[in-house]
């Protein structure tokens, strides 16, 4: 085996160089003593051409799970610092690549493929737009498609990212809500999309869930997802195609309402009015406004004549100092 031997004071600079030319061997560990660091490399000829000292040395293998922890292990620092978030939906990787580093997309694609070898499509993330919150995506590597099956919390979720909204980062939140639910509850999920919340809830609990969604493509996929998971579910799901603001007034009240509210939509009054025991209401709030948001929820409870206990938790980052939050509302009377 081969490695490059460098003085400790030069180690950081050389590590970045090895990453940038793509010859750092991530399957083996570097070793160090008081004066030197030896980095594992995959190509000694390139290392020599860079003027580095190549040595024969036995370097330990990393455990499989530690080969690559994240993109920072694989990309030069200047590229990684400018790269946006990376999400995996099924076998599709979605990454934010600013224009200023778009010329490095082959390096970025190579790193993603090493980190996620099962990925078959890599797409560049654009902006959300339109009534259905569809994100603009450009396939930059792999199969020319944006449909896949995503696995989460013991369920399978069909998505077509060119036609529907789906956020894989809510996996933990969907599980949290499912664990709060009790068997026998009647639950309403407006803005249900391809029904990830209803699926996860019904996966774990024997409940009846009503899912309301306006996007006809999402409704079609939701129906396919219901069939796909039929044998996995303890509960039942009823899918309703329509506008939340038109459908909900005609529905009865529910034990619990889970509202993954789209950004810019105010459905607090409506969703609270349909909840008899619990409401989980999502919104996007600046960190300085979180307590004010909680007070707004309490004020709406008072306006509707409900005594409520309200706690607000940060769910995920949206942009600097702005968070997706969830108001967990317990209706006491």
From Swiss-Prot:
S-adenosyl-L-methionine binds at residues 174, 191, 213-214, 243-244. InterPro entries: MeTrfase_TRM5/TYW2 (IPR030382), SAM-dependent_MTases_sf (IPR029063), TRM5-TYW2-like_MTfase (IPR056743), TRM5/TYW2-like_N (IPR056744), Trm5a/b_N (IPR040601). Gene3D superfamilies: 3.30.70.2580, Met-10+ protein-like domains, Vaccinia Virus protein VP39. Keywords: Cytoplasm, Methyltransferase, S-adenosyl-L-methionine, Transferase, tRNA processing. One of its GO terms (cellular component) is cytoplasm. It catalyses: guanosine(37) in tRNA + S-adenosyl-L-methionine = N(1)-methylguanosine(37) in tRNA + S-adenosyl-L-homocysteine + H(+); 4-demethylwyosine(37) in tRNA(Phe) + S-adenosyl-L-methionine = isowyosine(37) in tRNA(Phe) + S-adenosyl-L-homocysteine + H(+). GO terms for molecular function: tRNA (guanine(37)-N1)-methyltransferase activity. GO terms for biological process: tRNA methylation; tRNA N1-guanine methylation. Its main location: cytoplasm. It holds the Pfam family TRM5-TYW2_MTfase. PROSITE patterns: SAM_MT_TRM5_TYW2. Its EC number is 2.1.1.-, 2.1.1.228. CDD domains: AdoMet_MTases. Changing residue 260 to N: Lack of tRNA(Phe):m1G methyltransferase activity, but does not affect tRNA(Phe):imG2 methyltransferase activity. It comes from the Archaea. Catalyzes both the N1-methylation of guanosine and the C7-methylation of 4-demethylwyosine (imG-14) at position 37 in tRNA(Phe). PANTHER family: TRNA (GUANINE(37)-N1)-METHYLTRANSFERASE, TRNA METHYLTRANSFERASE. This is tRNA (guanine(37)-N(1))/4-demethylwyosine(37)-methyltransferase Taw22.
